[in-house]
């Protein structure tokens, strides 16, 4: 929770830009998720735990959309506004189902309270059809995010740019592994969402502080080198080694 909050503060302190805006929204969603999960962990009644779960879903329903808007903007792929609004509408419908889940069995087929051996109570939530609809959206969204980050970040640009792209890629890859493990039922009493969002925030923090993820001047300089129509090769004359080739130089 504190790591996600720190990431929100660091992103908010960066120079305003398209990437900064959507990365901030992504990390605000991550912070909401971790706060909701923490409140559920310490809840003493079923009603309090259910309210905390609903709070966490406010972040869960929006984090993927904001992450996609960030990565498409960062890699200059671009995202169709109609697709973004369609995803927002879809997530709003699912969020409405979560907020009223005790009145129907669409998102959760059943809701009960379970006492663990350690004396802590947890919610037992049997997954409904809309839960799987949300999980499918998350998996497709994360795969799309990873593909865009891999193509536009990891495999493109200078060494530092590739390291930055790798961190952006890992910010989604590790959470999807945890989500798949959870969906497979290996740890039914352990919700990996908080761990996944924390890993994501750590990756973004390192990318920002170490590799200038939101440094507008540095990113602009790199894109000038990459987008120029002339071939550019930077060589270390002491070690007789090529340090950088822009895309045009690679085709020569």
Where do the protein language model's features map onto the residues?
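Individual alpha-helical transmembrane segments in multi-pass integral membrane proteins
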Residues: 1-4, 15-106, 130-140, 191-200
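Alpha-helical transmembrane segments
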Residues: 6-10, 146-149, 205-211
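Alpha-helical transmembrane segments of multipass membrane proteins
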Residues: 8-9, 35-38, 70, 176-180, ...
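Alpha-helical transmembrane segments of multi-pass integral membrane proteins
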Residues: 12-36, 53-55, 125-183
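Interfacial "cap-and-anchor" motif at the non-cytosolic start of specific transmembrane alpha-helices
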Residues: 25, 152, 158-226, 233-235
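Juxtamembrane membrane-water interface segments that cap and precede transmembrane helices
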Residues: 113-130
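Sensory-domain cores of signal-transduction modules, predominantly PAS/LOV
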Residues: 230-233, 241
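PAS/LOV sensory domain surfaces, especially short acidic/polar patches at coil-to-helix junctions
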Residues: 239-251
